[in-house]
């Protein structure tokens, strides 16, 4: 059985998604605890979030080696390859995913959520452009020192 057709592949994708989401949830919970003046609880959540990131990265390592990017299905590896996958992922998000999410949210009467999805589509388009610019520069050999402004938008 090929790896992409295996239950192990599906389990790794689910585990990667779950651990990644746990990281974000615990990061948010740490912020709540900080606002509540509970630094020990915040530290516990931050430490746990870091652990979940480690788990997710190991899952991604297996996925990358066996089946590529779990979001795009494209290969992962060196920066050139990773940029191609990032462009594809961000492009899908701004051309298909978020516009459809916004349409459905608006149709169901959730205008604020629809507006949020529309905003995200614009941000993802910006991300795709930044990744595409980096890809073009890397392919042409004109990649310069990292742009400090990039971190503001990631």
Residue positions per predicted region:
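Non-heme di-metal
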Residues: 1-154
